Amino acid sequence: MSAAAPAPKPLYEQLGRRAAISTIVVLISVIPSVVLLAITKEPAVTWATGAFILGFVAVLMGGAGVATYTVFITAIATPVAIVAGGTPIAGAAFMALLCLMLGRMSHYGLHRATLLVPIFMAWMIISPPFWGADKVVDRTDSTFLLWMAITFFVGGIVPVLVFPHFLRKMRMPAPKPHPRSESAPYTIVITVLCTGVTYWVLADTKQYAGAWLISTILVLVQVGDVGTVSKTIQRVVGTLLGMVVVSILVLQVHSMVVLYVIGLVFGIAALTAKFSPHYWVYMALITPTIICFTASSSTQVKNLGEQRAQDVLIGAALVLLASAITIGYSHLQKARGESPTQDLPAVAGVPTLA
């Protein structure tokens, strides 16, 4: 007789283990920011925490090799993104380049490993952090540009150096390549939408937090037609619930240090809920997390929250419209009997990239 399958662990035990791991990851993610903040005394370097998340996701989704390339590319791209955001045309062109890169990575199944690169660079293009005692953004300040590149490199390289050792015994899912019939529409959709939005936001100075709209588009658009509508609805619901939390924080908390600590707590909860089947729970927790981390004042927390709610709704509408067009085109191809086109030698080379 075959041995009986082991009974699943109780839910509280699973959540406790996830919470413990999430706490460790979040606490480690703060270390680069603390070190750089002690050196520079500039709040802008707390973006190292975001860079840490970028490197951590790249390690999980693509392996140490892909993560290393991702961190180096992000560090080099950071000053370019900040300078490019000085004019709408240059900023939109650089965003188009990043989206084309992400679309190409989807052919190899590596788009999830590199997704945060254009998302974080959207912030650098549209709304880079303040620098200096005057709290101004000088996109041509060489010191500022250099330190932001260092910030993204230091924050991103830490998980690349630390976590592969602990993850070596885990069976991580292999990247899933996509045929050109799926990766090409995906590339076109994200490039057209994000490029157009970037130009619009840079041309309209009132849209200081328009990077939320770009991140909404990039997160919601899927390769193929799997789960787009469901994920869009859950993201909107979760973000609106997170907005309620942000509104309460604005009324009760006026210290940026306290807000940062609150952001860490929500970050732990968000990581714990990340692998939950209920995506809206994760979105409700990650919304106040990111807003608390990226706002430079308690007033801006409220403004960021309000604009994010608008951006999510607009982005969701754009994504659903674009998805309807691409899904319809895909079904039309299938009805005509056209088979997917796939670059087999390139896809077979995926392991060499990881």
Regions found by a protein language model. Name each.
Residues 176, 333-354:
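Short, highly charged, low-complexity non-transmembrane loops/tails of multi-pass membrane proteins
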Residues 1-75, 323:
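N-terminal signal-anchor module of multipass membrane proteins
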Residues 176-200:
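Membrane-water interface at loop-to-transmembrane-helix junctions
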Residues 33-50, 80-97, 148-154, 205-213, ...:
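Structural signature of hydrophobic alpha-helical transmembrane segments
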Residues 81-180:
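Membrane-interface helix-loop-helix junctions at boundaries between adjacent transmembrane segments
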Residues 137-158, 300-322:
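Structural signal for the N-terminal portions of transmembrane helices
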Residues 58-70, 88, 103-117, 225-234, ...:
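Membrane-helix interface "capping/anchor" motifs
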Residues 193-253:
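Transmembrane helical segments that form the transport core of multi-pass membrane transport proteins
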